[in-house]
Amino acid sequence: MFQKKNNEKLESFIGANSSFKGDIQTKGTLRIDGTVEGNIDTDWLIIGEKGSLIGDVRANGVIVGGKIEGMVNAKEIIEIKGKGEITGDINTPKLSVSEGAILNGRATMTKDTNVIELQVRSKA
């Protein structure tokens, strides 16, 4: 099992022999070892080596050991492990790609996910 850096407990799990169709919105950590078709909104997402997801992801952090087909937006980090694969665009401030991992898409790296409002200066 992948070790998360923030030591949160695993709260939701989709097992290896399970499949799910539909969107998932949950707090905490979601681990997928089965098959999911739908969009996911969670704090942390872990895709196990045999897990697969077809859909978009919005999370604080994403760890991919299996496959994701869709857009992935992470506020903190995306980690693609050695057998992991993402097909789709990603957006994150930190990206870790292990040897053997696959990223088929565009990666956008942002310094900060906070929006800063700019002040308009009047011409003197």
Residue positions per predicted region:
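Intrinsically disordered, low-complexity terminal regions
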Residues: 1-25, 29-31, 35-37, 46-52, ...
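Short, small/polar residue-rich loop motifs at catalytic or cofactor-binding pockets
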Residues: 40
